[in-house]
Amino acid sequence: MTISVVIDTNVFVSGLRSEGGASRAVLRAALQGEVEPLFGNALWLEYRDLLARPVWSDITTPQERDQVLAALAKRGRWVTIYFGWRPNLPDEADNHLIELAIAGGASAIITHNLRDLGRGELRFGRLAILTPAQFLEVKR
C-alpha cells in the first residue's frame, strides 16, 4: 500500500536543486510511485510560482519545468479541502499544509520547517511532521 504524503515546497525545491540528498530521494520516491504526493490548490500554486522564478531559467527550460510538474501530478492525488483548521500555526501561510494533509488522510508532511509546523495549537495524532531524512528512515 502506497502511503500518502504532503511534500512542502521547501522540500520540492531542494529536491530539484540538489544532485542527491534526502529531499531528492523524497522527490524521486514520489515520481516513482513509492509514495503518493497530495496536492491542493495552494500547494500546487506554490510549486508553479516557485518554478516560474527567473533563477530556474538559467538551468531549465519552461518545458522541462512543466514536465516535472506533469510527472508529479500523474503520481499524486488532488485533494479538495472543505474544512479549514485556522487559526492553528504561528505562520498562517503554512496552515494549508495541515489542512491538505488532514483532508487527504496523509501519513506525514515532509518539510524542512519542523519548528513552525510542529507548533500548532491543534494536534493531529496520526499525522507526522518529518524532515526528508526522518521520512526516509521511517519509510524503510
Task: Identify the function of each model-found stretch.
Residues 15-16, 50, 59, 120, ...:
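Residues that scaffold the ATP/ADP-binding catalytic core of kinase and kinase-like folds
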Residues 74-114:
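Active-site neighborhoods of divalent-metal-dependent phosphate/nucleic-acid chemistry enzymes
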Residues 1-39:
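Short, well-structured N-terminal submotif of metal-dependent ribonuclease cores
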Residues 9, 41-42, 112-114:
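Short secondary-structure boundary segments
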